[in-house]
Amino acid sequence: MLIIKKSSELTCVIKNLKKKNKSKIALIPTMGNLHRGHLELIKIGKLKSNILIISIFINPAQFSNSKDFRNYPKTLNEDIKKLIEYKVDILFCPTLKSMYPFGYKNHTLVNVVQYSSILDGKTMSNHFIGVATIISKLFNLINPDIAIFGQKDFQQLIMIRQLVLHMNYNIKILSAPIIRCFDGLALSSRNRHLSLEERKKAPKIYNILLELSKKIKLNKLYNLKKDYDAILKNYLIKLNNYGFKVEVLSIRNAKNLMPIDENSKQAVILCSAKIGSIRLVDNIKIKL
């Protein structure tokens, strides 16, 4: 596996790869602390390409506060061992200076306006602007044929599809399903920070999403806003009683995250909630 830390070196490597007409490049952007969910992305990448590039960069621009950034798990050595085992072709793990030579606070920003301030964007100041900015930089540096993201961060996935469309990137966006623990908790790098008691409660989010999806299907309330708002309120109370501080619990069109209506064919139920200081996100899609 080739390990690259400088953007200039990456540019040269990509240029040489592009000269080979049969090279099909897949990119999987990550912030490291790799787990089974990332392995699923890698499996798709290896299946759909012949050059697989993983990026590991903990992007300060997408954190709401400096404490979260400092506390994010940094496991580069362990990640490198895993990527070698998974037979990844290239690891791009740039320094902060390499990605933001003038400082990220002074950097030109990319704002996908339709998605940066709704749902999770309401409570996570500038998060999606930071994500869109770093993904744009990676796309510009690598110019992959495909890029692969997980469905757990569903709003991010939809936003990136919009980014590709609006900025005329010739990149196919693929997604991988959520990978869960034995009890239903969605795998996340932040799970390691949960206390034993918080870890026991954490799967309640997925349980609530399952109950909610069954309730909606059973009652056929796909396009009656007043009805599903009432249902959401009941489950919001349940989550609060379990000890969660709910930031988002919403039913949206799975294609564009707009409110569902009579023309919606698939919905997504989104939940973002804190337990203690740890923020968990999850979702479940349902056919309408």
Curated annotation (Swiss-Prot):
<keyword id="KW-0436">Ligase</keyword>
<dbReference type="GO" id="GO:0005829">
    <property type="term" value="C:cytosol"/>
</dbReference>
<dbReference type="GO" id="GO:0004592">
    <property type="term" value="F:pantoate-beta-alanine ligase activity"/>
</dbReference>
<keyword id="KW-0963">Cytoplasm</keyword>
<feature type="binding site">
    <location>
        <position position="62"/>
    </location>
    <ligand>
        <name>(R)-pantoate</name>
    </ligand>
</feature>
<feature type="binding site">
    <location>
        <position position="62"/>
    </location>
    <ligand>
        <name>beta-alanine</name>
    </ligand>
</feature>
<protein>
    <recommendedName>
        <fullName>Pantothenate synthetase</fullName>
        <ecNumber>6.3.2.1</ecNumber>
    </recommendedName>
</protein>
<keyword id="KW-0067">ATP-binding</keyword>
<feature type="binding site">
    <location>
        <begin position="31"/>
        <end position="38"/>
    </location>
    <ligand>
        <name>ATP</name>
    </ligand>
</feature>
<dbReference type="GO" id="GO:0005524">
    <property type="term" value="F:ATP binding"/>
</dbReference>
<comment type="pathway">
    <text>Cofactor biosynthesis; (R)-pantothenate biosynthesis; (R)-pantothenate from (R)-pantoate and beta-alanine: step 1/1.</text>
</comment>
<comment type="function">
    <text>Catalyzes the condensation of pantoate with beta-alanine in an ATP-dependent reaction via a pantoyl-adenylate intermediate.</text>
</comment>
<feature type="binding site">
    <location>
        <position position="179"/>
    </location>
    <ligand>
        <name>ATP</name>
    </ligand>
</feature>
<dbReference type="InterPro" id="IPR014729">
    <property type="entry name" value="Rossmann-like_a/b/a_fold"/>
</dbReference>
<dbReference type="Pfam" id="PF02569">
    <property type="entry name" value="Pantoate_ligase"/>
</dbReference>
<feature type="binding site">
    <location>
        <begin position="150"/>
        <end position="153"/>
    </location>
    <ligand>
        <name>ATP</name>
    </ligand>
</feature>
<dbReference type="InterPro" id="IPR042176">
    <property type="entry name" value="Pantoate_ligase_C"/>
</dbReference>
<feature type="binding site">
    <location>
        <position position="156"/>
    </location>
    <ligand>
        <name>(R)-pantoate</name>
    </ligand>
</feature>
<keyword id="KW-0566">Pantothenate biosynthesis</keyword>
<feature type="active site" description="Proton donor">
    <location>
        <position position="38"/>
    </location>
</feature>
<dbReference type="GO" id="GO:0015940">
    <property type="term" value="P:pantothenate biosynthetic process"/>
</dbReference>
<feature type="binding site">
    <location>
        <begin position="187"/>
        <end position="190"/>
    </location>
    <ligand>
        <name>ATP</name>
    </ligand>
</feature>
<dbReference type="InterPro" id="IPR003721">
    <property type="entry name" value="Pantoate_ligase"/>
</dbReference>
<keyword id="KW-0547">Nucleotide-binding</keyword>
<comment type="similarity">
    <text>Belongs to the pantothenate synthetase family.</text>
</comment>
<comment type="subunit">
    <text>Homodimer.</text>
</comment>
